[in-house]
């Protein structure tokens, strides 16, 4: 009985686990932007662009890279800030996301390529 109470108390004091279940990488299109909640709605490329399939949470430490194409087929990769990303991204923007899947099914972005 005492052991059961001790385990219950331990679970209450430690709080909810924040670990990520698995890492995912995929190519998506943006369906909506929720800057206030720091997230974007996504759908797989080729699926209905008006129907959100999942949320991707973008934090200040997320690495965001945008590829800029130059003349002659050359390109330059530019790092973007969090604010720059939310200013740039719109419905229909194509992107590649690498991150961890949270317990609720959403994706916590570690890297985003535009």
Role assignments for model-derived ranges:
Residues 2-55, 69-114:
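Short, flexible, surface-exposed loop segments at domain boundaries
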Residues 61-63:
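Small-residue (G/S/T/A) turn/hinge positions that recur once per unit in extracellular repeat modules
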Residues 66:
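A short-motif feature that recognizes glycine-rich, charge-decorated loops
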């Amino acid at each position: 009985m005492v052991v059961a109470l001790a385990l219950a108390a331990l679970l209450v004091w430690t709080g909810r686990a924040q670990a990520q279940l698995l890492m995912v990488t995929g190519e998506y299109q943006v369906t909506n932007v929720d800057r206030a909640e720091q997230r974007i709605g996504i759908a797989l490329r080729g699926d209905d662009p008006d129907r959100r399939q999942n949320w991707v949470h973008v934090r200040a430490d997320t690495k965001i890279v945008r590829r800029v194409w130059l003349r002659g087929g050359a390109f330059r990769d530019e790092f973007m800030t969090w604010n720059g990303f939310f200013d740039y991204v719109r419905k229909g923007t194509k992107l590649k996301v690498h991150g961890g899947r949270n317990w609720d099914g959403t994706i916590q972005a570690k890297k985003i390529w535009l």
